[in-house]
UniProtKB/Swiss-Prot annotation:
This is Large ribosomal subunit protein bL36c. GO terms for biological process: translation. HAMAP family: Ribosomal_bL36. InterPro entries: Ribosomal_bL36, Ribosomal_bL36_sp. Pfam families: Ribosomal_L36 (PF00444). It comes from Oryza sativa subsp. indica.
């Protein structure tokens, strides 16, 4: 999980999801997991 100021999709399988007021990226590739901090 990378915590970044700006999250974006890295590949086509990345999905932007809003959970508990935070924007997250979930993907089949674990390296692409991100959260907005």
């Amino acid at each position: 999980m990378k915590i970044r100021a700006s999250v974006r999709k890295i590949c086509t399988k990345c999905r932007l999801i809003r959970r508990r007021g935070r924007i997250r990226v979930i993907c089949s590739n674990p390296k692409h997991k991100q959260r907005q901090g």
